Amino acid sequence: MSVINCEEVKRDEFHTEKYYESYNIFGAHIVTEDEMRGVRFTVWAPHAKAMSVVGDFNEWDYEQHKMLQVTEEGIWSLFIPHIEEREIYKYAIETMAGDVIFKADPYAVYAEVRPNTASVVFDIKGYEWNDKNWSRKKKKKSVYKEAMTVYELHFGSWKKKEDGTLYSYREMAEELIPYVVEHQFTHIEIMPLVEHPYDRSWGYQGTGYYAATSRFGTPHDLMHFVDECHKYGIGVILDWVPGHFCKDAHGLYLFDGTPTYEYKDKDVQENPVWGTVNFDLGKREVRNFLISNALFWMRYFHIDGFRVDAVANMLYWNKEGQEQSNEHAVSFLRELNEAVFAEDEDFLMTAEDSTAWPLVTAPTYEGGLGFNYKWNMGWMNDVLKYMECAPEYRKYIHDKMTFSLLYAYSENFILPLSHDEVVHGKKSLLNKMPGDYWDKFAQLRLLYGYFFTHPGKKLLFMGGEFGQFDEWKDLEDLDWNLHDFEMHRYMHDYFKELIALYKRSKPLWQLDHSREGFQWIDANNNEQSIFSFIRQGDKQEDALVVVCNFTKATYENYKVGVPDFEYYNEVLNSDAEQYGGSGQVNKKRLKTFQEPYHNQTAHVEITIPPFGVSILRPVKTRKGSKKQDGSKTKVRSNVTSRGKR
């Protein structure tokens, strides 16, 4: 990609039109002009009175390197010869009020390690990628009809060195990737890696949207990390925050002394929940900044997806106490998704949205926002409330476990067990479970069994796979020493077996977004808090029967209606002794009885374990078996879901 000389750019391309390569104009680019090597600095500051570039090269004297205003709308530029890579710099901006403020470059691709705040000249080009095979394989797969297991993590607290320092991008490639491969996750989702000044913001309050945070190394080091992920078949999703940004003095806030990237109207500018300000998504220059940024990460870092943070905060703003939709945000999100999918039709665009806004994952040409996935926050909240309830009272909130199936096909959903639910006093997943030590582990195994068999793709926050006992502590690493304890090892073994079963079982993911893929057997047994259902794949014989018991009672010879296959085998039981359970399993092949039950044509009798999930797979179809209407037996279903992009 060539650097565009900003003096040759028509002002309409950035100020009034869709221009998604703004990173080629703005920022600090190493170039040769008039046979001299140096750096071209370009910045947008529409209300600046004067601009200059400062750094060690001029002893931070803002009188030396004055910038030239090249458009009336406020593009400033300057070529400085003999400046080399790794030079640190800022922009000195004289405001209309006569003050001089110092700002980091909004388009810088590298920055000093915090607490320092200067931008760093860096040649982003030149990394040699080795992921062509990954790209070819990705194009052969459907993001809708494949297994998807996402491992969400915070880069700085997954694991630390013995002295407490952080692993670099390259070191994390050596530490993290084998772990992810062992657990058969298909993707990792990393909490924001844009440059940010405050560790405890977890990256959600950024100052440098184009700069991969220098806490862990250089941009090329991060490229190496992504390249290695692709080498081992792992997709990389980044958390991305296009709705709001932090108010640190060196960042985007009041960039030229006036609201530049944020709204002017204080009622909609301020975001009091997080102490941030909202991007002015109605301003063309801001849209070009953000959409160019998304494409920059795709093109330069080969990212496979974004989890777009706080979409609810973007869709609605609270002005004078009235909740109103933000039409700027609605049109921005549609424009963003159109640009992203024009670049890569196999990209993952996931909305973190807790609202009931319709058609979030419908294409824009159908009136949707254009995402292809949405976090199912309702499912997460309902299920965790149910699990936190004492088992004997769960029968009174039975609908929390069934309600999600009323809307499961209204969007393309990912089921998140995310970082938000294991922090700020909410307890870890394991510690949310009521009861004694054994009960907690049994119920977490049960939760995971329900999680992996419920329609929707899967996301789990780090530590959940082995039963992290304490809630997430962002300044520490995970409690890896828990592997010294037997029950945590059992939990870890169970999780790995469960995710392996999920990946090799087409019924659990092939029809995630179609009503054909799920059927209740019994959704109404609130007295015993038992749920049973069928997951179905494309083929009739691709079916699994799932029975979940959310109390500590054990049931012998429990009748479960099933599709009419001759035999069933239990392929997983969360109560097996090798997982730390009591051993109430169904070891023998289960013969079906030709008596209708639960609105099915046959039934089996099984042992249902305490706080357990039992997954049954048919062995073979009964030869010549017929339903009462004379048709061949198949799993009953309703209408298919609407078409996808």
From Swiss-Prot:
Could you provide one GO biological process annotation from this protein's UniProt record?
A: glycogen biosynthetic process
What pathway does the annotation place this protein in?
Glycan biosynthesis; glycogen biosynthesis
- Keyword Glycosyltransferase recorded: yes
Keywords in alphabetical order = Carbohydrate metabolism, Glycogen biosynthesis, Glycogen metabolism, Glycosyltransferase, Transferase
Taken from the UniProt entry, a GO cellular component term is: cytosol
Can you name one GO molecular function term for this protein?
1,4-alpha-glucan branching enzyme activity
Q: Where is this region: Disordered?
A: 619-645
Q: What class of enzyme is it?
A: transferase
Domain of life, per lineage: Bacteria
- Which HAMAP family does this entry report, sorted A to Z? GlgB (MF_00685)
Record text on subunit structure and interactions: Monomer.
Sequence similarity: Belongs to the glycosyl hydrolase 13 family. GlgB subfamily.
Q: Which named protein is this?
A: 1,4-alpha-glucan branching enzyme GlgB
Q: What is the lineage of its organism?
A: Bacteria, Bacillati, Bacillota, Bacilli, Bacillales
